[in-house]
């Protein structure tokens, strides 16, 4: 950033974030579940806004977890491995690299 500032160069910092989701009884559980599942699984979860935490009040937590599971099944079917839409690691080299993280 210092080098960019010295030359008035625009800079964008990707700071990441843990992107928590908070769900309580005022939320539409079905909508929240679909959006959480979509956000996490889009691009195999490799986006800066993919939710990493779901915080839910006790009165909705179980229903939300069930609806997220339903949403994942709706998006990718009963067998995600057979779904062309389910993100994958593309080769053994990348798989090994990720295992070392």
Give the positions of each predicted feature.
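ALDH superfamily catalytic-core signature
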Residues: 1-101
């Amino acid at each position: 950033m210092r080098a960019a500032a010295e030359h008035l160069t625009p800079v964008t910092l990707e700071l990441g974030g843990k992107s928590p989701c908070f769900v309580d009884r005022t939320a539409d559980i079905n909508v929240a579940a679909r959006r959480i599942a979509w956000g996490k699984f889009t691009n195999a979860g490799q986006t800066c806004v993919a939710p990493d935490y779901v915080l839910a009040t006790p009165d909705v937590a179980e229903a939300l977890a069930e609806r997220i599971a339903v949403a994942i099944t709706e998006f990718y079917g009963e067998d995600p491995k057979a779904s062309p839409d389910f993100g994958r690691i593309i080769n053994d080299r990348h798989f090994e690299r990720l295992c070392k993280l």
